[in-house]
């Protein structure tokens, strides 16, 4: 297993060749390519020469923050769902990004994850390794049974953020990462990627006009889940500030359980839920 260097806030640790090699080897096979039509298998088939070239390119981007234009572009395709295909709502969209960019994204993700894991609270499940929503549901059931057994009141409010990943405000995300002391250079590289990101719809063999997105995390990007988790953590931290909570099990106080982007807020009294979680339910 590759040991990823710990990049601190003041460290501009260069990208290792081993990081790039591990990223290339882990590229998915038999998946649709991005705008450059380069499949992952072709990148992997290049061997040492391609790995060396990517090592230089990735370090150049890491040092300057400047991404090659094709690496910032997403090709959007539509896939039909059930129902009347004359209606737009019966299609889902998939954003395809080029495989060469995924090499650097994998490297960045390996550097981002340790910092993100140490920032995110214990409550989230389904968005991090070793914490499944199945275990979270089991914990919720045990908690409810315990309160029923002791004839105590337990109030829940379930929050499902509509199009949560599409509503992340970029400026707030970068300020949150700085607040949580993420590596400055890592933030700079990711922020520049978002500043340059362009997308175009690919339909019936034709590609439409390119357009910018100024809100939301990138669909199909390896970093998106971690970035969303960081953003949501800031929201929850602010919402629960000065809120002690009254629900406890095993000596631990619980104010909420999270299932990916869904939240179960809980309290021993109904009015306790209104103050911390009420503002999040206002759309």
What are these language model-derived features?
Residues 20, 24, 34, 54, ...:
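Mobile genetic element proteins and their domesticated derivatives, centered on retroelements
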Residues 1-89, 95, 103:
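Surface-exposed loop/turn segments and immediately adjacent short secondary-structure elements
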Residues 30-35, 52, 64-70, 85-87, ...:
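Short helix-interrupting loop/turn segments at helix-coil junctions
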Residues 30-38, 87-96, 134-178:
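Conserved catalytic palm subdomain of right-hand nucleotidyl-transferase polymerases, strongest
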Residues 18, 22-23, 83-84, 138-155, ...:
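A short acidic-Thr-Gly-centered motif at the start of a beta-strand
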Residues 13-26, 53-61, 107-112, 135-148, ...:
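Inter-domain linker/hinge segments that demarcate the starts of reverse transcriptase
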Residues 89-120, 135-141, 162-165, 214-242:
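Conserved pre-motif C helix in the palm subdomain of viral-like polymerases
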Residues 161-260, 267-276:
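Conserved polymerase palm-domain catalytic core
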């Amino acid at each position: 297993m590759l040991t990823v260097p710990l990049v601190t806030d003041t460290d501009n640790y260069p990208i290792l060749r081993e990081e790039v090699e591990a990223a290339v080897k882990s590229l998915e096979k038999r998946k649709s390519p991005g705008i450059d039509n380069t499949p992952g298998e072709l990148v992997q088939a290049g061997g040492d020469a391609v790995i060396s070239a990517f090592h230089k390119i990735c370090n150049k981007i890491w040092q300057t923050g400047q991404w090659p234009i094709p690496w910032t572009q997403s090709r959007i395709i539509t896939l039909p769902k059930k129902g009347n295909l004359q209606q737009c709502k019966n299609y889902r969209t998939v954003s395809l990004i080029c495989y060469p960019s995924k090499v650097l994204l994998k490297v960045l993700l390996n550097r981002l994850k340790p910092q993100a894991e140490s920032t995110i609270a214990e409550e989230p499940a389904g968005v991090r390794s070793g914490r499944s929503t199945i275990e979270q549901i089991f914990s919720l059931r045990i908690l409810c049974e315990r309160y029923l057994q002791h004839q105590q009141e337990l109030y829940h409010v379930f929050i499902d953020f509509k199009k949560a990943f599409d509503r992340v405000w970029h400026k707030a995300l970068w300020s949150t990462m700085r607040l949580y002391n993420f590596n400055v250079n890592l933030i700079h590289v990711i922020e520049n990627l978002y500043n340059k990101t362009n997308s175009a719809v690919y339909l019936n063999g034709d590609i439409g006009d390119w357009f910018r997105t100024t809100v939301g995390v990138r669909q199909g990007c390896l970093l998106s889940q971690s970035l969303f988790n960081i953003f949501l953590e800031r929201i929850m931290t602010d919402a629960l500030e000065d809120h002690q909570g009254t629900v406890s099990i095993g000596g631990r106080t619980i104010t909420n359980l999270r299932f990916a982007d869904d939240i179960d807020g809980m309290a021993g009294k109904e009015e306790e839920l209104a103050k911390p979680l009420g503002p999040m339910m206002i759309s």
